[in-house]
Amino acid sequence: MKTRVTRLTVAAPNDVSALAQAIESGEVDPTRVIAVLGKTEGNGCVNDFTRAFATSTLKRFFAERLALNETEVDERIAFVMSGGTEGGLSPHWLVFEVDDSAPSRDTTTPGLAAGVAFTRDLRPEEIGRTSQVELTRDAVLRAMAAAGIQRVEDVHFVQIKCPLLTAARINEAAARGQSVACHDTYESMGYSRGASALGVAAALGDLPGDVRDEQICREWSLYSSRASSSAGIELLRNEVLVLGNAPGWDPEYRIGHAVMEDALDAQAIERALASVPGGDKIKLTPERLAGLLVKAEPSASGSIRGNRHVMSDDSDINGSRHARALVGGVLAGQLGDTRLFVSGGAEHQGPNGGGPLALIVRS
């Protein structure tokens, strides 16, 4: 078996020209695509419709290529669009394919394994609560099974797309006599991301016990070092992509992870590379970098290594947007590449002010 990752630069949220060219050249086989991750150039907030624009464009594109309707495409491909390319970050897509028929060229080295799973649609009153934690946990376990990953320690990154609350959704719940986790629609993004991340932590055995509603977005000592969740208005379910290394998968692509302890922790790249099977023999160059995924969030302390920051005090630009620009610049400077999947909002995803980082390399 083999997972292939193709990184494509895009000119706009509806730009499928690079993807079409990759398919025409044989670089990408649309029948094997299981997920498309994308950084779009919106604000990453509630009213960022670049995510929905890109998702609807991609669904229509694959429906035409696969001779399916969009509902059928929705059942086989996870579309995870993360808004916000602040600073020098470059909008791009990461296309994940799985070829079940490809034999591994090296049976001694585990290779990149990928699997997807979806929850059912969440009701508004379930977003940001234990129901979302439990549904996510179950979906992560199903995605692991789809990837053939048997040990939780072989999972290096779990990327999730999750829903958020809108005024209409809050009112719909109230009409049925149901309460919601919060009434601020932007704040609901954090609750959804946090509950999703805790679902990953529960699936991977990183929690001391069951999660309670009152712990979500409050008890920050609970977190996953391998979860990345991105909230959006364009869906009602959680879409889960599990990435790890497993025997029997071709090792041309491999993954490793580490945790950025703060926004300046560029050394996390080296630690992530060290966790890649055979990573000590890999010299990381732009050609070998298949993808980088990382979470970013302003530290709640208001400082970075003892120096004050004002990311959380800016009334014009949300703090997560500042954090994406900062972390993106730190990592791009190390890698010489701005096509990095830097996602803001790291509730229960790594330590305060830091976040999980995953590195996909090509041998």
Curated annotation (Swiss-Prot):
Report the transmembrane regions from the record.
Answer: none
**Pfam families reported for this sequence:** Amido_AtzD_TrzD
Q: What is the regulatory mechanism acting on its activity?
A: Inhibited by barbituric acid.
Start and end residues of each stretch annotated as RU A: 1-103
Which one GO biological process term can you cite for this protein?
Answer: atrazine catabolic process
Classification from the root reads:
Bacteria, Pseudomonadati, Pseudomonadota, Gammaproteobacteria, Pseudomonadales
Pathway given in the UniProt record: Xenobiotic degradation; atrazine degradation; biuret from cyanurate: step 1/1
Please describe the quaternary structure of this protein: Homotetramer.
For this protein, what is any one GO molecular function term? metal ion binding
This one is known as: Cyanuric acid amidohydrolase
Q: Which keywords appear in this protein's UniProt record, sorted alphabetically?
A: Hydrolase, Magnesium, Metal-binding
> Which residues are involved in binding substrate?
51, 82-83, 193, 230-231, 324, 343-344
Query: Can you state which reaction this protein catalyses?
Result: cyanurate + H2O = 1-carboxybiuret + H(+)
Q: Please indicate if the UniProt record lists Coiled coil as a keyword.
A: no
Site label Important for substrate specificity, positions? 320
According to the UniProt record, where is the region RU C? 253-363
